[in-house]
A protein has these predicted regions:
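Aromatic- and glycine-enriched glycan-recognition loops and surfaces
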Residues: 44-55, 63-65, 74-87
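Sequence-level detector for tyrosine residue identity
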Residues: 6, 21, 39, 43, ...
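Active-site-adjacent pocket scaffolds in enzyme catalytic domains
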Residues: 1-16, 126-130, 134-194
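Short charge-dense sequence patches
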Residues: 30-35, 66-77
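Structural preference for beta-strand elements that scaffold enzyme active sites
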Residues: 35-37, 66-68, 95-97, 141-144, ...
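Non-catalytic propeptide/linker segments at domain boundaries
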Residues: 1-62
Length: 194
């Protein structure tokens, strides 16, 4: 059976200070360094995490380098045993973000008003409510990337929606390179290293 919740242990500010990455005032200590994030995923399909990911997950060297695994939490509806296995066998260097817009696949800009195609009112509160239960269960606070596609980019209401369940950040496409929306970091999806 699934656990009630799968909390994540994030690196603390103190640990980052001890490693020399943060100054005492909480600002980043660059010291001429560049930083890179290893984002593993686009695991938005049960076939990916049940058939492909095990080859990566079972690699003996996993855990030597911090990795951000991006898995759609709604996959718990299709392959809960796989989701459970990854979380209970994660190393301290395995972190998790939600893949592809959150707990499901859509273009969230289409939920913002005005909704010219449907004429409906904003669907952002329904999206936040839907995502929140999955984020809380799986200990998620980051949305790995937000696919805008043909939809408008997120406006202030759209950013507020994501901040309500993804407070540690989102990575949309149609945004400035970096932005801080209230306290939520926003980094534009840009180039991939394949």
């Amino acid at each position: 059976p699934l656990q009630e919740k799968y909390p994540q242990k994030w690196v603390t500010h103190q640990e980052l200070m001890d490693r020399g990455y943060l100054n005492r005032d909480g600002t980043i200590n660059f010291q001429g360094r560049n930083f890179i994030l290893f984002y593993v995923g686009d695991y938005d399909s049960s076939s990916w995490i049940a058939q492909t990911t095990p080859f990566l997950w079972d690699e003996p060297s996993r855990g030597e380098v911090p990795l951000m695994w991006s898995v759609s939490p709604v996959l718990a509806e299709r392959v809960p045993m796989v989701m459970h296995n990854y979380r209970v066998t994660a190393t301290p260097n395995d972190y998790f973000a939600a893949a592809d817009n959150g707990a499901g696949y859509l273009m969230p800009g289409m939920l913002q008003e005005p909704r010219s195609v449907s004429g409906l009112k904003s669907g952002l509160s329904a999206w936040a409510k839907h995502c929140s239960k999955y984020y809380q269960k799986w200990g998620l606070t980051i949305t790995g990337f937000v696919i805008d596609g043909e939809a408008p980019g997120l406006d202030s209401d759209g950013l507020d929606c994501y901040a309500s369940f993804s407070p540690n950040g989102i990575v949309p496409q149609k945004m400035p390179l970096t932005l801080l929306h209230n306290d939520m970091p926003v980094i534009r999806a840009d180039y991939d290293i394949v």
